[in-house]
UniProtKB/Swiss-Prot annotation:
Function: Folate-binding protein involved in regulating the level of ATP-DnaA and in the modification of some tRNAs. It is probably a key factor in regulatory networks that act via tRNA modification, such as initiation of chromosomal replication.
Coiled coil: none
Family: Belongs to the tRNA-modifying YgfZ family.
Ligand binding (folate): 27, 189
InterPro entries, per database record: GCV_T_N, GcvT/YgfZ_C, tRNA-modifying_YgfZ, YgfZ/GcvT, YgfZ/GcvT_CS, YgfZ_barrel
Subcellular locations according to the entry: Cytoplasm
Keywords: Cytoplasm, Folate-binding, tRNA processing
GO biological process: iron-sulfur cluster assembly; RNA modification; tRNA processing
Single GO MF descriptor: folic acid binding
Originating species: Escherichia coli O6:H1 (strain CFT073 / ATCC 700928 / UPEC)
Protein name in the entry: tRNA-modifying protein YgfZ
Entry GO CC: cytoplasm
Length: 326
């Protein structure tokens, strides 16, 4: 990517975040174009893409035959097909899997590194962007396109915007916002996604979890009414037979080191500690707090105490901004 990522700063929680412009270099864009795009994606992802309008974006999962996610995709309509945003570490293997059946369809599936991904969040983010675009997305219209730019709106953990654009517009936005906005890299957007309870699937956890283990059903990412797609039988079984015993949790506290994706944590059981869960993502905030996104049993007691393995510090469950009740 020719557009240079901004230097890192320690991320801040949404409630205290000043106006911030972020380069999303740890995320990557991919596209599907061609006459069969919608039909092809409908047979590959958990969401009902045939019902998607130009004004919507959604989080869908792309699964293997056993219902385990290669990746989750932030999906929106783009040109005569679709585009999606996923973690850069999983894009290449995810596209390889997606292309396996494409030989029989009129589609072109490709990575897109020409466009730039930026995030805008923090204090008065909407007001800052209102000076630069004629229309901004909102709850009613979550995707807005203007020229070479697509803007995606997010409600949680606080209003924020993801911008997909060309290099010239990215440079213009940076020049216009540089004076009033802090600049940061992907870690700040990652911190906001963790706070929002959006599952982060990096390479270490690709092919490990069914979508419901990461709360995708609570985020509107699974249609149980659409036709066949890869992995559907297992995803449906998890819902209708209660086969899923896991959920995505948000933990906050302190830790002397940050656990890596794929690592387990320890749960306090009386005087002892027992290994539990799988870490998806972690960040350390500027106030020293550590936030951890982890998949664990879905029946954890709300007052449970956790720690990074053999650590002296502890982590506790924080509420997510959505309900898991079905």
């Amino acid at each position: 990517m020719a557009f240079t990522p901004f230097p890192p700063r320690q991320p801040t929680a949404s409630a205290r975040l000043p106006l911030t412009l972020m380069t999303l270099d740890d995320w990557a864009l991919a596209t599907i174009t061609g006459a069969d795009s919608e039909k092809y994606m409908q047979g590959q992802v958990t969401a009902d893409v045939s019902q998607m309008t130009e004004d919507q974006h959604l989080l869908a999962a792309h699964c293997d035959a056993k219902g385990k996610m290669w990746s989750n995709l932030r999906l929106f309509r783009d040109g005569d097909g679709f585009a999606w945003i996923e973690r850069r570490s999983v894009r290449e293997p995810q596209l390889t899997e997606l292309k396996k059946y494409a030989v029989f369809s009129k589609v072109t599936i490709a990575p897109d590194d020409e466009r730039v991904l930026l995030g805008v969040a923090g204090f008065q983010a909407r007001a800052a962007l209102a000076n630069l675009f004629s229309e901004l997305p909102s709850r009613e219209k979550q995707v807005v396109k203007e020229g070479a730019t697509t803007l995606l709106w997010f409600e949680h953990p606080a209003e924020r915007f993801l911008i997909v654009t060309d290099e010239a517009t990215a440079n213009m936005l940076t020049d216009k916002l540089r004076g009033e906005a802090e600049l940061n890299n992907s870690q700040q957007w990652l911190a906001l996604n963790i706070e929002a309870g959006f599952p982060v699937i990096d390479a270490a956890n690709s092919g490990q979890f069914i979508p419901q283990a990461t709360n995708l059903q609570a985020l509107g990412g699974i249609s149980f009414k659409k036709g066949c797609y890869t992995g559907q039988e297992m995803v449906a079984r998890a819902k209708f037979r209660g086969a899923n015993k896991r959920a995505l949790w948000l933990l906050k506290g302190s830790a002397s080191r940050l656990p890596e994706a794929g690592e387990d944590l320890e749960l306090k059981m009386g005087e002892n500690w027992r290994r539990t869960g799988t870490v998806l993502a972690t960040v350390k905030l500027e106030d020293g707090q550590v936030v951890v996104q982890v998949v664990m049993n879905n029946d954890m007691e709300p007052d449970s105490i956790f720690r990074v393995r053999d650590d002296a510090n502890t982590l506790r469950i924080e509420p997510l901004p959505y309900s898991l009740e079905e």
